[in-house]
């Protein structure tokens, strides 16, 4: 067994050390630890994170462990071994998710589900999804060590391809469980020319059973997920725990502007129909309309494609994306219509044709009040300061909200950085989140069913 000092020295020079040193590189003062875990094994949890980070580790820093990649498969196989060693009944379901069940005293009670995902974005970090996954493993190990048998069965789940890198939509594994995967999605082809259904087969799933894999109504008590915040609110405020009130809804639109491509040197300024100029006005309009209303809604123009794309040709066609997020779907629907009307007027004034199509809409997923209550009480037991907050990023919990009550626990992301090799959460905060997950599950276990 390592001493605390030896363990910290190894961590400082290990796979997670590069992110850990970011604090000193940026000249920031280390903040006091406001939450101490006493029930879970903090060092074992951190070691599990370090071991997981080896799968897809990059020499330049960070991790690339794309869903349905060899590194993703290796990581899942490694965890399957850990779960079997912990005595769980382990399976790979039709969507290639890991499902590991621990029997309860009463099998007639619905199962308590908890977990996250282990895939990453390209050149991502070692904490997004991984904190929740390794904490779920640590919860099981802690229960085993303390000889605690819950009343309810426990179902640890690691969802496949949450990031959705190979294909257009994320949250694949959880959407499959919730019955939200359409048959045509299985035929989508990635950049290698491989269909999604082929990847599912290669990694132990069965695409033919995905349409029938949704658990029976009432068989899931609740779903609880621990995750890094992936934003800077907790970090800036120095608060170790976020109690998530809901995951925002998302509307994504494609705007197409058709102007007139022409010679950049011979066309007078007053005779131009420049689609890029109109696009610039629309981008500013999106920002102004989103910020003109009270609330926490956000809007982003994140992609823009200009044609013909030459320095001596007036842009004749522009396609851009507009994304709106808020806990109220009605608000972002109304905001989208305001943007549509404003953009149409701007385009008409410039003599540019305009169209705007909604391509994706994710409904907001509110967490269950009882689950939030018990997360809060678990934090109070540890004297951990909390902040009730919305999640601006999508998570598997929003798919599971279609099936059962859900809850989420956030831990801070240093400087709000995520999807980056510099993504980092301190060991003490990871352990604090894990113990609140553990305590909350035990509190929920006292309740037969949530109303």
Regions found by a protein language model. Give the residues of each.
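N-terminal export signals
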Residues: 6-27
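C-terminal segment of N-terminal export signals and the immediately downstream linker at the start
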Residues: 22-57
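Midchain, well-structured core segments that form catalytic/ion-binding scaffolds
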Residues: 35, 161-162, 166-330
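Zn-dependent metallopeptidase/amidohydrolase metal-coordination segment
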Residues: 37, 55-58, 115-116, 386-436, ...
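Active-site-adjacent substrate-binding region
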Residues: 54-58, 193-245, 283-288, 357, ...
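A non-catalytic alpha/beta surface segment that caps or lines the substrate-entry region
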Residues: 57-103
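Alpha-helical metal-binding/catalytic segments enriched in His/Glu/Asp
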Residues: 114, 123-160, 253-257, 268-289, ...
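His/Asp/Glu-rich mid-to-C-terminal helical/loop segments that flank catalytic regions of hydrolases
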Residues: 245-247, 263, 267-293, 341, ...
């Amino acid at each position: 067994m390592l001493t605390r000092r030896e363990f910290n020295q190894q961590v400082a020079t290990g796979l997670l050390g590069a992110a850990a040193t970011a604090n000193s590189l940026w000249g920031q003062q280390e903040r006091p630890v406001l939450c101490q875990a006493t029930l879970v094994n903090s060092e074992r949890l951190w070691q599990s994170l370090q071991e997981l980070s080896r799968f897809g580790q990059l020499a330049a820093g960070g991790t690339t462990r794309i869903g349905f990649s060899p590194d993703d498969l290796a990581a899942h196989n490694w965890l399957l071994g850990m779960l079997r060693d912990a005595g769980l009944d382990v399976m790979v379901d039709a969507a290639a998710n890991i499902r590991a069940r621990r029997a309860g005293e009463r099998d007639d009670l619905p199962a308590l589900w908890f977990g996250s995902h282990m895939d990453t974005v390209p050149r991502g970090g070692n904490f997004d999804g991984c904190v929740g996954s390794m904490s779920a493993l640590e919860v099981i190990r802690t229960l085993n060590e303390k000889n605690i048998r819950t009343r309810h069965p426990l179902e640890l789940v690691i969802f496949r391809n949450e990031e959705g890198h190979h294909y257009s939509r994320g949250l694949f594994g959880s959407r499959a469980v919730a019955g939200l995967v359409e048959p045509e999605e299985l035929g989508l082809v990635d950049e290698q020319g491989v269909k999604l259904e082929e990847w599912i087969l290669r990694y132990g799933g069965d695409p033919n059973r995905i349409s029938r894999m949704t658990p029976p109504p009432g068989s899931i008590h609740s779903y609880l997920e621990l995750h890094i915040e992936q934003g800077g609110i907790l970090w800036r405020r120095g608060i170790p725990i976020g109690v998530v009130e809901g995951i925002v809804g998302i509307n994504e639109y494609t705007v197409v502007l058709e102007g007139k491509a022409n010679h950049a040197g011979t066309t007078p300024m007053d005779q131009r129909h420049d689609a890029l100029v109109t696009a610039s006005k629309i981008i500013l309009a999106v920002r102004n309309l989103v910020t003109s209303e009270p609330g926490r809604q956000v809007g982003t123009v994140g992609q823009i494609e200009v044609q013909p794309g030459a320095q001596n040709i007036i842009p004749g066609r522009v396609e851009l994306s507009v994304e709106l997020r808020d806990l109220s779907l009605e608000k972002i629907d109304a905001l989208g219509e305001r943007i549509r009307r404003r953009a149409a007027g701007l385009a008409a004034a410039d003599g540019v044709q305009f169209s705007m199509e909604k391509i994706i809409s994710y409904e907001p997923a509110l967490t269950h009040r009882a689950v939030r209550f018990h997360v809060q009480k678990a934090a109070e037991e540890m004297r951990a300061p909390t902040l009730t907050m919305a999640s601006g990023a999508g998570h598997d919990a929003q798919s599971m909200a279609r099936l059962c009550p859900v809850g989420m626990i956030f831990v801070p992301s240093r400087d709000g950085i995520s999807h980056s090799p510099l993504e980092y959460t301190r060991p003490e905060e990871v352990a604090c989140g894990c113990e609140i997950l553990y305590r909350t599950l035990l509190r929920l276990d006292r309740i037969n069913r949530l109303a």
